[in-house]
Structure formats: C-alpha cells, structure tokens
Amino acid sequence: MMASQEPALELNGEQRDSVSETAEVLRSKSLESFSDLVDDGKTLLYGDISKSFPFKTCDRILDDIRISPWFLKKFGSSVMKQPMLQYSRERQQLQPWNLVHLIDQVNLRSRYDYDSMTCPGKNTISVMFALLVDPNFTPNDFDDIDKFPEYFFHLKITVKRRSYLENFNRHVGITHYHVLEPESLHPFDKRDIFIMEEKDCRLVDQSIFVSADTNKLILVEIIKPEFNSENLAEYRTAKIEERYKNACQEFDLLNPDDIPSQAECLKTLFMIFKNPLQRKSANSEFKIISRDSVALNSQINTDWLTTMFDFSLQKTAVEDNVQSGEEYKPPDLVDYITDFKVRGIREAYTRKSMEVVLIGKQSMLLENELGTEKKTVAKCFSNQHFSASHTWWFNILNHQHIEPFPYDINYHFINLSVAFKYIDKDIIKNYETQIALDQENISHYFDALQYVTNAKGSYQLIAYCGKQDVVGYEDLNNALQVFGLDPTDIDASLLDANTMIEYYNSHLLRSSDNQRKDLRNALRVLGKYLGSQKMLFLVEYEPYYNVQQAYTLLKVDETVDDDIIQTAYTINIADAPGLKKDYDRAIFTIALDRRSIFLLNVLTDECPEFAQYYNCTDISYDEALNIIEIDMNASDDVILEVFQKKWSHGIMTGPDYLLKLKMALQNIGFTRNSKLINHFLDTGIVDVSCLPVATWPAGINNVGNTCYLNSLLQFFFTIKPLRDFILNYDDDSAKLLDASEYHSRRRIGGREVSKQEELRSVQFVYHLRDLFNDMIHTNSRCVTPTKELVYLAFAPSNVEVEFGDDTVAQKELIDLTTDVVEDPTDTTRHLASCDDDIIMCQSPVALPEHKTSSEAGTQQYSVQVAKISADQLENTLEIGRQQDVTECIGNVLAQLEIASEPLSLEDDLEQNDLVKQLFYGRIKQDLIPVNDEASVRTKYERFLSLLVNTGDHPKDIYDALDFYFQNDYLNLEEYGDVKRTVSISELPAVLQIQIQRVYYDREKFMPFKSIEPLPFGETLYMDRYMATEDPKLLAEIQQNAELKQKLQDLKQRQRKLLSQNEIGLTLKSSLIETKKFLQSGTLKAHDIDADNIPSSIAYIDILINNIDEELKSLFNKITDLETTISQQFSEFKHIGYSLFAVFIHRGEASYGHYWVYIKDHTKNGIWRKYNDDSVTEVPQSEVFNFTEGNTATPYFLVYVREGQEQETIEPLKRILQQQE
C-alpha cells in the first residue's frame, strides 16, 4: 500500500520548461561543478526524499528535540533520526526538557535571517538559537554553578525555505519531513547552510529533515554547553574571593572588603561577548580591552580571552613615544554570512552569551532567595527574558501552531507522528506514508491507527479502519494471550484455524461476560490474520451472553412459542433490514437456550452462512456417527434417542455444539434415507408413525366423551409402583384382602367399606389391570378402555353395580361400538352439546374384543362385567363432567385402596397402603388463641392435593401456595379469636396441586373460567411450607408474611388511586376534568361567584401532583418489595420436587377439551402430549406456555420427589405380543 500524495499546484508551460531544463542541467553536472551554477529556486533538489525513512511532522520534531536530552544522557544518542517505533513507548514516560529562547533581540540576537547565496531573492535561511533546560534542576547555592553543564544543552535550528516552491508546490495539510543524511546534502544547500563538523566535540546531535513537497530544509543541532564544570568552578565563591584578593595586591584601587558577587563576575563575562557581537560593520571601531583593566583582572580569568574567546593580545599603540602596555582585541565577527569560519565563532559567542545570561539570572535569583546583603545590579541579566513558548518554532517553519493535547505523547500517536487535533485526512495520510516506507511494521502502525481512531471517535477514521485488511501487532499478541499462547514462542501464521475454534468453543460458554468479549475479539483478530472465514463467521454470529437481550431485540416475551419467535424475527427483518445480523444472533441465542431444532432450521433457511459452515456433506458418515457417539448398526429410533439425549442434556461445549449435532444427524438421515430422522430434523418432533410401536407409549381411544379420564389413566400408568401393583393384582390379592387381620376394622376415607363397594373396587382394579396390560402388550398405537372401567371410574361409590359373566361383557362392548343404545336419542349428539371432547373423534372408534388376562399372556382371573345400559353410562359421564379432576382421582384411588390389602391401620383405623404412601401427605393445623398463645390446639389432616386459587392473582406457583399456607385470624364460637396456621408435617412421594380456575359470576349467574397465567417451574421447593422449629426459617417465614402484607396494602392503595368511577374516570382524571371546568368560564357565564376559582385550581394542581408523586412512590416500593420477596428462601432448597405431569383444559367453564403432558425422565427428559389416542412429543416451551389469553390452561400439576424420578415414574412400558 503506497502513501497517498497531495497533488502539487499546476505550473504553467513556461514554469514547467524552466524546471525541466534546470533539472536536466543539474543531472548532467558533477558535484564539483555546482559552484558555477546558481539555484533557480524552482527545482526540487531532493526529488526522491519522499522515499526516505523515517519521516516526521514539525510537531513530532519539536517533541523529539525536547526529549532528546534524556536519551542522550541515558543512551548516548538522540532520537531525532530514529523511527518513532524505537522510542515511542519510552517517550510517554518522560518529562520533556524546557525549550527556552530569548525574547529581546536588541542586546543579544539569538535569531538570524539572511538570503541564500545560491538563490538570492527566492530562498532564505533562518537560524535560531535556544536552550534545552532540565525542568528538575534548581541550584541551591552559588557553589552549584559548576553543575549547570549537566542540566542544559544549546539548540540551533536552521531552516532553509524555498519561496517559489512554497507558493506553487506546497501540499495541503500537515507537511512531512524526511530524514536526510548529511552526506546527501545538496551542494547548493552546503553553500548556504553552516553545519558544525561531526568531529566537533561540542556537537552531540545533528539531524537534517527535508519536506517532500517543497524541499524545505530543517537542520537541528544539539550542542554541549560552552563552559564545562571546570570553567564554571572559577565562579564558585572561594575562587571569586581568591581571584579578587590577588587583584587587590596588584591594584591599589580595589577595596579588599568589596568582593564582587557571582552575578557581577558573570556580568563582566557577558560584556566581553556582547561588544564583538554588536559590532555592525567592518568600518566600526573595535572595542579594545586593556590588559590592566581592574574589573577584568579581578572578576575573570584573563587567560580565557585568548585561549577560549579568540581574542588577540597586542601591544598598545605608541602615542608621544609612550607605550602604555598591552590590550585584548576581540575577533572580527562582521562577515559571518559568507565566511563560515567567522560564522562558527559568532555562533559560539552567541551560545556563550545565552549561557552566561541563563546562569547570571539564576545567580541573581539566589541572591534574593538566600537573602544576601549585597544585591547585584545587572541590567544585562534582568532585562533579558527567556520564554518557553514554542510559537517561534511554528513561525520559523511557517506552519500553523496546534495546541498540544494529552493524547499527543501516547506512543500510538507518536508512532504515526500525529497530534490529537490533526484532521482525519492528515492522520490517514501519515498512516499511509508510514506503511509505504516501513512495510515490515505495518501491524504496529495499524495498532496506532486503531488507537487514534478510538481516541478521537471519528466516523471517518472508523470507516477507514474497517476497510483495512490488516491485523494490528498488539491485537495479534493480545489475541494469542487470550488463547493461552505466548507470542514470543509461536509463529502465529502457522496456527490451525480448527484448533483455535475448538479452544474458543470450549471456553466461551463458561466464561464471564468480559471474558466472552475478549474471546470474541481474539477470535476475530486471529480469523482475520489467518484468513479464516469460519472464524469470522463464528464471531459475527456469536450468541448474546444474556438470552433476555435476544428476546428484547426481537420484541417478544420469553414465554411465547417458537412459531411466534419466527414471526417476530421475520417482521423485524422486514422493518429493519440493516439489523438482520443482530436478529440472526438473537434467534440463534434463543434457539440455543431452548435447544430448538425448529428455530435452528429457521436460522439455516434465512442465514445461508450457517448451512455453509455446518453442511452435512463436509463430514463423513463415520464422523457423523462419532459425533453422536452411536454404533453404525443402531436402528434409526435408537440413533434418534441418543441424539435427543445429547441434544437435551449434553453439556453445551460451545455455541456450535447443537449445530454439529444437527449436522451429524443430517448426514446420517441423508445417508440412510431415514424418514424418521429427516422428519425430526424438519420439525423437531418425533413422527410417532415412523417409530416402532414398541418404542412409544400407547394412546387411549375416546369411547364417547370420557372427559379427563383418559389423561388420568395415562397418568396412573406412568407411576411405576402403582402400575406394578395393578398389573400384579389377581384373585390371590382379593383373597388376601379378605384374610387380612385388618379387613373388618379398616376405614377408607374415614368410613367403613361395604362388601358391595369391595366387590366393585376389585372389579375396577381388574378392568384397570387389563387396560394397562393392553397398553403394554398391544401391537397397535392405541387401546380402548372397557365401558365398565369408564363407568366405575366416574360412578360415585354409593352407586351399586350389578355384575355378570364375561360373555355378557363382550356383547355389551360390541353394542357400545355400534352406538346401539336403549334410549332412541342420539347419545353422541347429546354428548357433543355438553363437551368438545366428542368432536375430537372423527368416526366411531372400533373397540377391541375384551381380552382376559390369559389372552394377554398372564393367568386368567375372575373378571366380571358390569351390567350397564347406555343411559347409565351417559348419566355417569354427566356426573364426571360435573366433577373436578380431584374428585375423579379420589374416586379411582379410593377403589384402589378398597381393593388393597391394608399394610397397617392408623390410630383412627384409617388404612395405610401403597396409595397412601404415594399420594397422601399430612397437614398440621394449629389454632392459637389470640389472648392465650400457650393454649395451642393442633390437628392433623391427610391431603391428597393442595388447592391454589387464581382468583387471588398470584404471580407464580409459590405466590399461590403462600396464599394457601398464610395465617388466618378467625372468630370461633368455641375458642373466640384465634390465629390459624397451616403447615405440612408429612409430604407424599407424589405431590399434586390443583389449580382452581372455575368461579361463579354472581352478576351473570353463571360459572366462568379464569385463564390467568400461573407460572411454575420444573422444580418446586417445599421447605417454607413445612412444620419446622428452625428459628432461621421461621424468621424468614414471618418476614415474608409481613412483607406480603405490606405489599398487599401498597397494591390496594395503588388500585384505589387507579380505580375508575361509574363514568370511567380515575381520581386524577376527575380532578383534571374539574380543573378544565373551572378554567372554562362556565361559572362566570352563569353569574356564579368565581372569586375563589384561582385558589381552587391551585389546590387541584397540588392534589394532582400529590397523586403523581404517590403513584410513583408506590410503583417503586412495590417493585422493590417484589424483588425482595422473590429472593427470599434462597437458602432453603432442601426439599425439592420435580414436575412430571401437567393436566390441561382448553375451553370455557362449561365445555372444553382435556389432555395431559407427561415428562419422561428416562428418555432425555422429553415431554409427551397424551391427547386420547394421540401420543406425541412436544417441546418444553409448549408445556411452560404462560401467554396471556391462552385458553389452554394447566389445572392440575403433579410433582415427584427429587431423586425418586427414575424409580417412581416410567411413562414408557411396552412388551409387544408375538404376531402369529
């Protein structure tokens, strides 16, 4: 990449010809013959200087001058000619020396301007003398004078300007000055510029810079002090006194007590230099100094005049034949322009003079600071002022003075030779020049450009950086370190992209937010450096750290289904196409969080890069099997099962973990042409029709309108201990029941059991056993319950049932399938009017022949058939519709208990059995008299389920349970005012929670269903509801109750302020309307006294403001309280339950449809939807759908104790019958 150059101003034809002719002549001449030529001032003497490295700007040169003393003293060399990369880092740690110059040019000139000798009239030379002074040096007394040489340097700046080229060839913007070696100096410039010889011991640094556009030349020379420490020691106090005493012996005029001060001695020294410098012309008379001068002999070392100052000692002229003695004659410094030897002496005199002024002024300051009695009067010092302003530098170069900025000394700014206040165009120009001249270090310059860009925040620079295909040196090293690599030990160009990606994936998801940012930036840098598009792709589409950010970006709630997210994604892209990549990242984030194949498919379709980099054809079949970790001989359903396990529960090793799994399964599905696998990949749902029957639970046909019974039967089937008990029930079980020692005394539900109930219950278990056997052994995808089972499940326990033999049962079953009923009314149509369930059956379901247990592969038992008419069945179903699910569960479980042999009896003779162990817990209720808290009356009650209400508007399941277990204050006739506390003393293995959703509308005189969402999670902790003596937990419970009461009071006040009156106005709205009325002038129009209207309006404004402030305060307090409450009990999570069944009702209070979701912990935690004869897999998001307005609402939740999931819950149990 070459540096861009500003175009030169156009020359006219005559000018171009002149420049060309001169250039040709110059090229044809030897260097020795240049003395015969005259520079026309129109030709670039250094046409190739732009290729010289390094280059610097005038600001950089100035700063280099000021920091060079540090480098000279520490390393013995200057930085003037060095590339900035070599010293920029050290520079930012240094304090530059002060660059001072003399303001007054009358008594002592420190600047000279004269015409060029080779091109007079067009080219000019300026010379400026200044001092570099250590800012940290301050003499403490007069004897510190000999330390001065260590703390300052002389600076000489020579600038040659070529006015013609300045006018016609100068580029716009910051000028670039390139280093020129002294031996390359053009002969024309050698004749014009006096350069100290390198062998001169006083010269410590000499640098030449030439501008590329106009060949303006800058000569920088840093020179040692003219007086060394030994010289200045002559002006220590003791030396001054010694010299003065010696002079007193020689000159009687001197007063031995009037010893001159250090400043007086320096003043005399200054006057020696001043006179030769002020001589104007060769005709001017020399100011001779007598060798017998009292001041000279008493204040300085007279030998210096001839040995150091180029004076000559001569005899005094003879007058009247009398020779008075000897005198010192100063050197002739007039012809300094043409005579370089004279110029050298004159410049030395100028440096000596400035040096003496600097030291003399310090000496006079010390007189004041030390309070000496004698104060020196020396106008040559007091009238001379040094300035630290750098304006002269920019004036002499004819450049704009740019005020410095703190960023300017940052090494990145230094490396580009830019200042913070440079315009973007100049910064880019400097960068391009640097990389053109120093390609090897382009990465360093790009680092610098990026830093400058970030510091300035310039859009133009940001855009420019973005277009550069360069990786910065620091960026690369930082990236390597993020990846655990030592930049000094590794060649980054040899890195393997896949290895870097593996590292990135393995660390990303377990890193903090800041670490993720570092990883992402590092991968981007390495991807760019290695040219890996896949690495850059991973960076661009990295999922958001917080999934909530993705939901917010797509403007959806986290509870919505995948198809809603797809819709939101599509709409957002249509509205803002420029943000598509952000929306891609958002849907990718959500897909990973939900582990949703559907959303990943959407992303793959909409973002081809995902399909490009995770294409199933990029891996082999064997590699695909290895990714899923499955044997090649495994069947499709086994492969899918293993895949689902890894998909749902595998450790997310990186953001592409699921993409790799999906890619592997796609390869297998494509290779095997598997309908099952390919359907799953397309939908994310297992197509049950493609599965072997033995790998999926059987559905249950709807034989009429069995409401929620099918869901209950599936639910009971999944509970392994209960299912095993039912499957193993036989005549021996019934006989054991009769023989039990507890049989005659036992009670079920607190009452005695009749023989008829017992017979009925045994038959119910037989029929349930046969259904469960069918569900296990059938070769079909669904089974049909007998009408006896349906009838007995719904019929109340007090309804007597007549049983016949098995032959009758088969006939009755067949009659039921053909819809032949005793009542001529169409029962099917009647049922459909009551419940939507019947609509789910598209045609009459063919019921299977009733099989005895022997036909199912087990021993035949005494199964009897209930004699049930169609009317009886319909009436029983109507009873079932009027029951809630818990009544049916109670009826079914009661029959199971009645048919069970008692394990033991409670004190109240209540039977203890498997059902009690699985489903029943125990509630402890304490009645505490308000006036006598010691007299606690405790009562224990069994519970089958806990009832929570949506009418209380709980925000989640915990909030609902809190209402159930909250303390109540009652007035009882027997005890008076009491506090009732409720807690759990014993929990069941299977915890059931009923959600009350049906309420009665007293205005419409009809029931209605509440569809208010009640969020719940997969885990429920019951610690806070247990009967406990733990003081910490009790204190937390008490605080929780107090906070909730406070929250309730705040919300009640909020509702009151926001409530509307009969015309729909809130209190604030009413006040506003009142104010408008008062302001309308209606009262005045009707001659009603309105004197107090202004005060009334003012008062209304106060009320309105008070309402606003109170509502704001209420909102903040409610928010804070809800946050505090939600974080309570975080330490009490020892008694956990896992959700495994969710019963759903869709519809209204008087009609609807039922199904159940059941989780299979043994099959990767998948959720299945049991919808009568259909059993399908569903995404977890469908189960936990708490969308407002959703009429498919959970009404019954079932949890199992944590740690007992595998042993208690087994949804899939299939052993197929052998086909003949």
Curated annotation (Swiss-Prot):
It catalyses: Thiol-dependent hydrolysis of ester, thioester, amide, peptide and isopeptide bonds formed by the C-terminal Gly of ubiquitin (a 76-residue protein attached to proteins as an intracellular targeting signal). One of its GO terms (molecular function) is proteasome binding. Its EC number is 3.4.19.12. It comes from the Eukaryota. GO terms for biological process: proteasome-mediated ubiquitin-dependent protein catabolic process; protein deubiquitination; regulation of proteasomal protein catabolic process. InterPro entries: Papain-like_cys_pep_sf, Peptidase_C19_UCH, UBP14-like, UCH_repeat_domain, USP_CS, USP_dom. It is an enzyme of class 3 (hydrolase). Residues 698-1202 form the USP domain. Keywords: Hydrolase, Protease, Thiol protease, Ubl conjugation pathway. The active site is at C707 (nucleophile), H1153 (proton acceptor). Coiled coil: none annotated. The keyword Glycosyltransferase does not apply. Has an ATP-independent isopeptidase activity, cleaving at the C-terminus of the ubiquitin moiety in natural or engineered linear fusion proteins, irrespective of their size or the presence of an N-terminal extension to ubiquitin. Belongs to the peptidase C19 family. This is Ubiquitin carboxyl-terminal hydrolase 2. The gene is UBP2.
